[in-house]
Amino acid sequence: MADTERALADAIVGLLDQRADGATICPSEAARRVDPESWRDLMPDARAVAARLVDDGTVEMTQRGIVVDPATARGPVRLRRAGGGASAWGPG
């Protein structure tokens, strides 16, 4: 994992650690933490890192509160700690 990707992963996990159980963050919050000036340029990487964190079971990606597959999610997404609620694939 490249330094930027590691920093994004650390930022995602760190931001979630600061939030209440079940709370969500936007991937842009992690990108802003890593590079406040050029965070928009990091957004594709932030979503890719979030997808890897989903794959390893660390976080869930949601849209409108429902867990979604990062491979098919389009548009705004939120991230939360894994195990946080309803799933598009069945009971969460």
Question: What are the roles of these predicted feature ranges?
Answer:
Residues A31-M43:
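Short helix-coil junctions and helix-kink-helix linkers
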Residues G22-R33:
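Short acidic, hydrophobic short linear motifs in intrinsically disordered regions
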